[in-house]
Amino acid sequence: MLDQLSVESIPPLLGASKAQLTHWAQTYQQPAYRGQQVHQWIYQKGVHSLSDITVLPKQWRTEIADIPVGRSQIHHRSAAQDGTVKYLLKLADGQIIETVGIPTQKRLTVCVSSQVGCPMGCDFCATGKGEYQRNLACHEIVDQVLTVQEDFQQRVGNVVFMGMGEPLLNLEQVLAAVRSLNQDVGIGQRSLTVSTVGIPKQILKLAQHQLQITLAVSLHASNQRIRTQLVPSAKHYPLEKLLKDCRAYVTQTGRRVTFEYIVLSGVNDQTEHALELAHHLRGFQSHVNLIPYNPISEVDYQRPTQKQLQQFLNSLQSQHITASIRRSRGLDKDAACGQLRATQMIDPASS
């Protein structure tokens, strides 16, 4: 992958493993440890240009200066009152993606995008209201984590693939990013969460990799009728089949599945819905995350009250379903769940 080729044909180095970078350095007749130095400077020191790696011989630095590391630019940064920071990152082709840094007392979490836009068109989600452009490459995903880590000057402890896009439609690059975040950046697999609305066959394909990551399935409904209304792709992936595949995932990996459930007042928040959901999940190694709807301008869904949320939670727990309410972060900067969208999908300066 990283043999000595013309600059135009060499992919960005970000996302490459220590072994790959060692081999790459050797193609330039450099000793193996030079590749290890490049690895350290890319992943630990956050270098944006190979010419800035001062421990390398000056002549070689000049020779490789034009080979891209694969880092993006911060196009815009906005901080919410709760400390959450939303970033618009400008990619090499001018496309804009969103990334969110979410600090808590215990850890720094990064919510990464896996696509530019999203083709799934979920009714309550801002990203789905915009145009889908393309999949992100591995380096464009890993870069988001390093960018937040550098900006906060704090080590990232948790990464969730819950930003723009459907990760399982970009499974190859997402898996490559998971490997790099784990082995190169040093984030444990159990601190990585991949979210999906459910893509036929892809959950089973993911299970074959036997990863220790968390799979989060965006369920959002207790029956097929409501789910089809909220998630158009559910027409091609019935709820029963989705849940069957999730059970198979648990069996194959030994990891419980997290079910994300955006609560919409008057739509999917009634006691009957909670009991229906509990029926589906009884005996299932799972956890339900209840997420209060975060408003977007295109639709008139209503956010539930705290009382409604608590009643729904109580109904689930009365049926012995493990569940919790997720606190919304970054709401005042449109950085909360379901609110992500790049206000400029392409930077005007690049066109």
UniProtKB/Swiss-Prot annotation:
GO terms for biological process: rRNA base methylation; tRNA methylation. The keyword tRNA processing applies. The active site is at E98 (proton acceptor), C337 (s-methylcysteine intermediate). InterPro entries: Aldolase_TIM (IPR013785), Methyltransferase_A (IPR040072), RlmN_N (IPR048641), RNA_MTrfase_RlmN (IPR027492), rRNA_lsu_MTrfase_RlmN/Cfr (IPR004383), rSAM (IPR007197). Its cofactor is [4Fe-4S] cluster. Residues 104-332 form the Radical SAM core domain. PROSITE patterns: RADICAL_SAM. It comes from the Bacteria. This is Probable dual-specificity RNA methyltransferase RlmN. The keyword Ligase does not apply. Reaction proceeds by a ping-pong mechanism involving intermediate methylation of a conserved cysteine residue. It is an enzyme of class 2 (transferase). HAMAP family: RNA_methyltr_RlmN (MF_01849). Disulfide bonds join C111-C337. It catalyses: adenosine(2503) in 23S rRNA + 2 reduced [2Fe-2S]-[ferredoxin] + 2 S-adenosyl-L-methionine = 2-methyladenosine(2503) in 23S rRNA + 5'-deoxyadenosine + L-methionine + 2 oxidized [2Fe-2S]-[ferredoxin] + S-adenosyl-L-homocysteine; adenosine(37) in tRNA + 2 reduced [2Fe-2S]-[ferredoxin] + 2 S-adenosyl-L-methionine = 2-methyladenosine(37) in tRNA + 5'-deoxyadenosine + L-methionine + 2 oxidized [2Fe-2S]-[ferredoxin] + S-adenosyl-L-homocysteine. Keywords: 4Fe-4S, Cytoplasm, Disulfide bond, Iron, Iron-sulfur, Metal-binding, Methyltransferase, rRNA processing, S-adenosyl-L-methionine, Transferase, tRNA processing. Specifically methylates position 2 of adenine 2503 in 23S rRNA and position 2 of adenine 37 in tRNAs. GO terms for molecular function: 4 iron, 4 sulfur cluster binding; metal ion binding; rRNA (adenine(2503)-C2-)-methyltransferase activity; rRNA binding; tRNA (adenine(37)-C2)-methyltransferase activity; tRNA binding. [4Fe-4S] cluster binds at C118, C122, C125. Its EC number is 2.1.1.192. S-adenosyl-L-methionine binds at G165, E166, S195, S218, L219, H220, N294. Belongs to the radical SAM superfamily. RlmN family. It comes from Acaryochloris marina (strain MBIC 11017). Pfam families: Radical_SAM, RlmN_N. GO terms for cellular component: cytoplasm. It is found in: Cytoplasm. Binds 1 [4Fe-4S] cluster. The cluster is coordinated with 3 cysteines and an exchangeable S-adenosyl-L-methionine.
